[in-house]
């Protein structure tokens, strides 16, 4: 369902990193991370970072 990059972003969100920190770590722009998060939220039906983290934890994606 989620792409490998989206899974990587969710893992970093769960680790408590900000969008800017994630962008720096992955060599992307913060806007690209925003786009990844919007895509993730839409695919899994959530509206927040904490809900995305909970979703990933419940499905053992982390």
Predicted regions and their residues:
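Helix-turn-helix DNA-binding segment
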Residues: 1-38, 42-44, 58-59
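Short, basic, alpha-helical segments at the C-terminal edge of helix-turn-helix-like DNA-binding modules
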Residues: 47-60
